[in-house]
Amino acid sequence: MKVGIIMGSVRAKRVCPEIAAYVKRTIENSEELIDQKLKIQVVDLQQIALPLYEDDDELIPAQIKSVDEYADSKTRSWSRIVNALDIIVFVTPQYNWGYPAALKNAIDRLYHEWHGKPALVVSYGGHGGSKCNDQLQEVLHGLKMNVIGGVAVKIPVGTIPLPEDIVPQLSVHNEEILQLLASCIETTRNK
């Protein structure tokens, strides 16, 4: 079973890689999940570098049924990445009470690829990012994803990179992340 951790920030100065690495380690180090044989792929939207969606396809994403119908090669590549995932963990900062435009752009470039996939949202920010977490979950429901829930991780405002002493403190969220992921796994197996 393949779990994708999609990093929602593309800023040059960001803590998203550290939060995504924390989530990945939490999953990999879980004794409860060790027999699940999970393959974890961290997907960095900064590296994928999708152009801003400007209706470059003749059809809107909801009308596209095959990866080959996308006009843009980066969108075709993105479609293949998402199609290969069984479970998706969105890791996103909260910017001005919302989630980043790059993440919205990446989500909006596709449609059918998201259907039925279990998802959870790990947001972070000075207040945990609960507003963007709720917004993103609503959008994912609209894409017919099976949204299991979200975790809001509070980090010190303006701390880039995260101080070494902060990352171990994130472990208070381990159990919540693992419970949500276990629900995603169960949902995937029961499809």
Curated annotation (Swiss-Prot):
- Taxonomy, superkingdom: Eukaryota
Which EC class does it fall in?
A: oxidoreductase
Q: Which UniProt keywords apply?
A: Cytoplasm, Flavoprotein, FMN, NAD, NADP, Nucleus, Oxidoreductase
Q: Which residues form the signal peptide?
A: none
InterPro entries to which the protein is assigned, alphabetical? Flavoprotein-like_sf, FMN_Rdtase-like_dom, NAD(P)H-dep_reductase
Cellular component, GO annotation: cytoplasm; cytosol; nucleus
Q: Where found, per UniProt?
A: Cytoplasm; Nucleus
Listed Pfam families: FMN_red (PF03358)
- Reactions catalysed: FMNH2 + NADP(+) = FMN + NADPH + 2 H(+); FMNH2 + NAD(+) = FMN + NADH + 2 H(+)
Question: Where is FMN annotated to bind?
Answer: 11, 94-97, 124
Give GO MF terms, alphabetically: FMN binding; FMN reductase (NADH) activity; FMN reductase (NADPH) activity; FMN reductase [NAD(P)H] activity; NAD(P)H dehydrogenase (quinone) activity
- Where mainly found? cytoplasm
EC number, as in UniProt: 1.5.1.39
Q: Which GO BP terms apply?
A: apoptotic process; cellular response to oxidative stress
Q: What induces it?
A: Induced by low temperature and by cycloheximide.
List other remarks: Present with 1270 molecules/cell in log phase SD medium.
Subunit comment: Homodimer.
Q: What does this protein do?
A: Has several reductase activities that are NAD(P)H-dependent and involve FMN as a cofactor, ferricyanide being the best substrate for reduction. May be involved in ferric iron assimilation.
The molecule here is called: NAD(P)H-dependent FMN reductase LOT6
